[in-house]
UniProtKB/Swiss-Prot annotation:
<comment type="similarity">
    <text>Belongs to the UPF0391 family.</text>
</comment>
<keyword id="KW-1003">Cell membrane</keyword>
<dbReference type="GO" id="GO:0005886">
    <property type="term" value="C:plasma membrane"/>
</dbReference>
<feature type="transmembrane region" description="Helical">
    <location>
        <begin position="30"/>
        <end position="50"/>
    </location>
</feature>
<dbReference type="InterPro" id="IPR009760">
    <property type="entry name" value="DUF1328"/>
</dbReference>
<keyword id="KW-0812">Transmembrane</keyword>
<keyword id="KW-1133">Transmembrane helix</keyword>
<protein>
    <recommendedName>
        <fullName>UPF0391 membrane protein AZC_4184</fullName>
    </recommendedName>
</protein>
<feature type="transmembrane region" description="Helical">
    <location>
        <begin position="4"/>
        <end position="24"/>
    </location>
</feature>
<keyword id="KW-0472">Membrane</keyword>
<dbReference type="Pfam" id="PF07043">
    <property type="entry name" value="DUF1328"/>
</dbReference>
Amino acid sequence: MLSWALTFLVVAIIAAVLGFTAVAGTAIEIAKIIFYVAIVLFLISAVMGFLRRGSSRTL
């Protein structure tokens, strides 16, 4: 689960570079939306990873 959190963080950083520096041109708004969605998914995945690490449950 923590690997997904890092993946979402990388996606968020890439979206931020493309969206906030105006490199993407017309895709700025889409990049900003992807950035915020990826940040939310990163936070959820990080919290779930830490919670699952604390429990001894495995799937």
